[in-house]
A protein has these predicted regions:
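Non-catalytic nucleic-acid substrate-recognition regions in nucleic-acid-modifying enzymes
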Residues: 1-137
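Conserved S-adenosyl-L-methionine
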Residues: 173-292, 309-310, 314-316
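SAM-dependent Rossmann-like transferase core, predominantly class I methyltransferases
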Residues: 150-184
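Short beta-strand/turn micro-motifs composed of small residues
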Residues: 8, 259, 340
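C-terminal catalytic and target-recognition region of SAM-dependent MTase-like enzymes
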Residues: 287-373
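A short, flexible beta-alpha/helix-coil linker loop
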Residues: 98-101, 158, 306-310
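Phosphate-coordination loops involved in phosphoryl transfer and adenosine-cofactor binding
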Residues: 87-90, 190, 251-252, 298
């Protein structure tokens, strides 16, 4: 069976591995920035449809030692591309190069393209065209320490692009990271979920999709595998229809968010409607100082407060973190989580975290802090 590699934000590898095991993937091995696994084409479809924390699902097809652009070209040119492409395909190459004798990512991608096109020109008299916007077959080149891996990109656009968030507030976290953080809390829909600093509403929307068993890729119109020679449209349609039939229609417990900013609340409600769940939840305007958990069974409270990326902002944000500590203190029985990129601000909460997970939000070193008031 083919080998695959699903990429994710650093720190989410254990969560992604758990997702893959739930999909019955074989030989699941977490790595740096992703998880390797083995499976058939059906599993590849399910991975793209169901994975909440993955960014891309890649199928490595060529690995070699290359120390120069010329060596890279030759390795690619000598590969049997008739197994995966025809001259009628359009292609694009995305590349990432580090710690290598090949120093320029764009030039490396160009040499891969040249190798593929020359292969077809010499064998068939025609070559694939390049379409960087929407290629029929996307390729991903990764070179580290002179070791190259060239993969087919089965996802196309990044899987974090769910399609429900055209409207964003300042500095949102992406959907895949938000879903991963919710999953990292252990929450699966069996208790209430609240966000007192909801921003775009991403935690709550991703949480609702988890509780409803709603696959994040359900309404996506194009995946990279749809341009592959071995794509089975009948099998894919059957799988997606079954996923739609398996969804719940109502939330077992409340999911809600609030924010002091009117624009954020309006954006969050619009995003929830775009996600098809606007009728199941409502975002309201509250100052966090006035936030109280509702009566009833305790659940999970999760938020992503600002963490002062610019010089001098720490002092302005300390009262907000102290207020979060007060909110947590009056929420006995609830498990409270803060995702922050500033450990000194996290200390302003005034409680000792019972758990600390280390992750990255882009290039920012962050922590998910868990508190039990």
């Amino acid at each position: 069976m083919p080998k695959y590699f699903a990429t994710c934000a650093r720190g989410l590898e254990p969560v992604l591995a758990e997702e893959l095991r739930a999909l019955q993937a074989h030989d699941v091995v977490p790595g740096r920035g992703g998880v390797a696994f083995v499976g058939d084409m059906q599993l590849l479809y399910r991975a793209n449809l169901y994975l909440r924390t993955a960014i891309r699902v890649l199928q490595p097809i060529l690995e070699a030692e290359v120390r120069s652009p010329e060596e890279l070209y030759q390795v690619v040119h000598d590969f049997d591309w008739d197994r995966f492409l025809t001259p009628d395909h359009t292609i694009a190459v995305d590349s990432n190069v580090r710690d290598s004798g090949i120093t320029h990512s764009k030039y490396a991608a160009l040499r891969v393209k040249d190798g593929i096109c020359d292969f077809f020109r010499e064998r068939h008299g025609r070559r694939p065209s390049v379409n960087v916007e929407k290629p029929m077959v996307g390729l991903n080149l990764h070179i580290h320490a002179d070791r190259m891996v060239l993969s087919l990109d089965s996802s196309g656009d990044s899987l974090h692009k769910r399609g429900y968030r055209p409207i964003q507030t300042r500095a949102p976290i992406n959907e895949a990271l938000a879903a991963g953080l919710v999953l990292m809390t252990g929450w699966r829909g069996e208790t209430p979920l609240l966000d007192p600093l909801c921003g775009s509403g991403t935690f709550c929307i991703e949480g609702a999709w988890i509780a409803l068993n709603r696959p994040p890729g359900l309404t996506r119109k194009w995946f990279g595998f749809m341009g592959w020679m071995n794509h089975n449209m009948t099998q894919w349609t059957r799988l997606r229809n079954q996923a739609r039939a398996d969804m719940a229609k109502t939330l077992p417990y409340p999911i809600a968010g609030s924010d002091i900013r009117c624009d954020a609340v309006n954006f969050a409600n619009e995003n929830a409607r775009s996600a098809g769940i606007g009728h199941l939840m409502k975002f309201e305007r509250y100052d966090v100082t006035d936030f109280y958990v509702p009566a009833g069974p305790p659940g999970v409270l999760i938020c992503n407060p600002p963490y002062g990326e610019r010089l001098g902002e720490d002092e302005d944000l300390r009262p907000l973190y102290r207020t979060l500590g007060e909110v947590f203190a009056r929420s006995p029985g609830w498990r409270c989580f803060v995702f922050t990129g500033n450990s000194s601000l996290g200390k302003q909460i005034g409680m000792k975290p019972v758990r600390r997970e280390f992750l990255f939000n882009g290039t920012i070193d962050c922590q998910l802090l868990e508190f039990h008031p």
